[in-house]
């Protein structure tokens, strides 16, 4: 049977003009109260795309007031039928489909994503996610409980209230949709702070939210820096929940701020150093490709990157050879250009961090198989890099690199590799490649990770809960559990004259 044909990918928009650079509050566009703006950089060219209004605490306060007003008892949003909330989310998905090429172009230009990926993956996944959450809107319900005594008892799942949502730069559109979709389906109101590197798709989505017909104040977007706008959200006394995707270091600060303020609910999806284990009986071609994509996709800028690759001793040399051969096939350049398969890192800081970790690998004795340096003279590009003979104590084996760098380590036994795989403060994801069903179940059960992929990698789905163990965070996004993260569970017990079964 032949595989289905890939859908046609249109050309990106030429000379895209950025329409929305202001703060979005109450369905209106505002200048920052401090009068400041910040530059948004194209990471492939290092040129300024535009300047965006820089929100800080005062702007967050303004957005919170709007969101709180929209959440008041008796407001249009609170009295709206749940099914109508779903209709609004579906309308937003339709508008995204209409403007899909524009969104993909913007995501590629601002976030450095390969345009084909931005069109076929980022926008497609986002549209499907919105439709998924739309379907949940009128299916969030409680239970009746046969409690003791002459009492009628039931539970209600109610929206938490005003939610702060802090978006990372590595998936600005997808994470925007994952967060607002779950929150809005339950009836919450939101203040979104996109990453300062990548605010453009969030601001454009704000215009579509208004066009779709969401009431004023339901969705507010405040671009700004983490140390100001992000900190204001985390510590705000009138925000009921904060959801953050980003580094473990910042996640700790957010949880601390939530605890020191009003003990707001917190969902964190943080860093990872995910193990990928390849046993000798695995389908070698498939394992090489999945492991490769697991660490090189989007220039390695993915939280679930398969950044600790454990390969069984008997196939190690051949696996390394094939991995190097695969890494050398990349064509680097502007991600908007056709034929390009690797784009830039997000900014100068991340670029320097990756190169520093590559140098540490060389100095600590890992064998550099290919790559190992900067590519080109302009843009934040890093050569696809593969290290072999990596040991567990090396920095490249312990620290999150967030770049196109593959570390390949050797193991001898199942007990050894499980112990080594779990020897990390992180626990976001893991991969296992084997044809032995018993081994697959044994290893996947033993791994301390929120998601374990068997004979595949990066197969995320909006229907499935996603989140981390240990220092990779707490709470879940997507799936039924991801929806319930945006609800409070209330028990109501009524005294009645007589209870009958």
Swiss-Prot record:
Pathway: Alcohol metabolism; ethanol degradation; acetate from ethanol: step 2/2. It catalyses: an aldehyde + NAD(+) + H2O = a carboxylate + NADH + 2 H(+). It is an enzyme of class 1 (oxidoreductase). CDD domains: ALDH_F1AB_F2_RALDH1. Its main location: cytoplasm. Keywords: Acetylation, Cytoplasm, NAD, Oxidoreductase, Phosphoprotein. It holds the Pfam family Aldedh. The modification N6-acetyllysine is found at residues 91, 128, 252, 353, 367, 410, 419, 435, 495. The modification Phosphoserine is found at residue 413. NAD(+) binds at residues 246-251. Induction: By phenobarbital. One of its GO terms (molecular function) is NAD binding. One of its GO terms (cellular component) is cytoplasm. The modification N-acetylserine is found at residue 2. One of its GO terms (biological process) is operant conditioning. The record marks 170 as: Transition state stabilizer. It comes from the Eukaryota. The keyword Methyltransferase does not apply. Can oxidize benzaldehyde, propionaldehyde and acetaldehyde. No detectable activity with retinal. Homotetramer. This is Aldehyde dehydrogenase, cytosolic 1. It comes from Rattus norvegicus.
